[in-house]
Amino acid sequence: ADSVVTGNWGADASLLVKASDEAGLPVDFYTYYGGFVGVPASIGEAGIGRLKQVTGFHANVGLGADELIEGYRSRFPQSNDDLYWLTLLYAMEMLVQAIEQNQSTDPLLIAKAMEGGTFEGPIGDVWIREDNHQLLQPIYVSTLARLGEEGVKYDVERTGMGFKTDGRIEAIDTVLPTTCQMDRPD
C-alpha cells in the first residue's frame, strides 16, 4: 500500500505519522482532521509531503480566502489557531438569510427557508440539499508543505508549515442519490 486513510486526529494522528516516519514506511496519510488544531504542530516535519487532508477549506485555497485569513489573524494576532471551519460562516450567513427572508425567528419557517438555500461563499457557492439537509460545498485535497513553497502563503499554527492544494472537487460533483426519508413537521 502507498496510502493510509485514517480518522485519527490529535495525538493519535501524530503518533501514527511519526512512527511510520521512524520505521521508514513510505506512505501518505489521508485524513479529514490533518489541519485540526494541534495536529500539524505535533506531527511536525514528519508530515511534510505525506500528511494529506480532505476538507472543505484550508488557509491556502486562494480565491476570496486571503481576506478571511488576514482578517482573522489581525483580530487574533497572539493566537496559534487558525480559521478552519468555514462551514460555521456558511451556517450563520444562511441562518441570517432565512430570518431576513421570513422576517421571523420561527424555527419552522427558518428550517423551510434554509431547505435549498444558497450562499455565495468566499471560495464558491454552497447550498443545502432539500432532500437531506446536507451542506454542499467545494472539497479540497491538500498536502502539508513548508511555508513559502508555491501555493503555501499561510502556515498553520505558526509552525512554518501549511497546506498546499492538490485538487478541488466542485460541490455539484459530490452530489449522490440519497435514501433519506426525512419526516418534516407541518
How would you label these PLM feature ranges?
Residues 3-23:
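Hydrophobic alpha-helical
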